């Protein structure tokens, strides 16, 4: 989705260098961007998809006293607040839209963030994430919107759930929370950072169990993009074979390891993120939990607590999608 959204500003800049876009050109560019976004979301709107795959579930997790999984009925019932603001995701930047949804500060008050939490990460169906300081979320009318001008948000408009900032009523948020903070297809609200809970077969590895396994370190550029530096960084974690062995899971020679993350695009059964077992000897994939020379835990803003790192020798056009943040499950399947 975010690649699609980047196309529109670039096109606008290129046109503006000549003479400025006409209204017709703006409408055409917006239509193209919306069509691309709709195509990107098609995999998650199949009739046989469950609610989590289609974004009609909102999960609240992390450092909260009351984690929850809200179904669409609950989301709709709680979405009683309105924010009237212009949107960064439309060509008519002067049109004030009446968004209806759930104020994030009310959501936080309900689920009880830990006192030391400083930020909240919103995860989208397509893997995009937006991390916002908790002080701003409590101060401003930041909304998880489900309607715009009385109509349910379509996929092309960022629905079912769209993270919206009050640019009109709180002008200071225009610079503080520019368009990169607005998030389409929100499915998870991660308060602070979750504890490690990696499911492998019928076992769940917690932080202590993960730390007891052989740790591997290496320096490399990372493929999660958001908030990570473009230069090499040290990452520390456990190889896939060691993780699977610790859980007593065998590796059939002709099998594959499916790596599942939090986002729907990383859990879609139609397009599993998988690694052939035969590749594990050649490519030491790491599930990483720490980064940097100080071995700091990977926070949610960087895709933690666990993320899959692709070895430099195996990183390429085909391997790039296997950079998976928020890893929470490993599954081994025999090839059919």
How would you describe each model-predicted region?
Residues 1-6:
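Bacterial N-terminal signal peptides that target proteins for export
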Residues 13-16:
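C-terminal motif of bacterial Sec signal peptides marking the signal peptidase cleavage site
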Residues 18-336:
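N-terminal intrinsically disordered, low-complexity segments enriched in P/E/S/T
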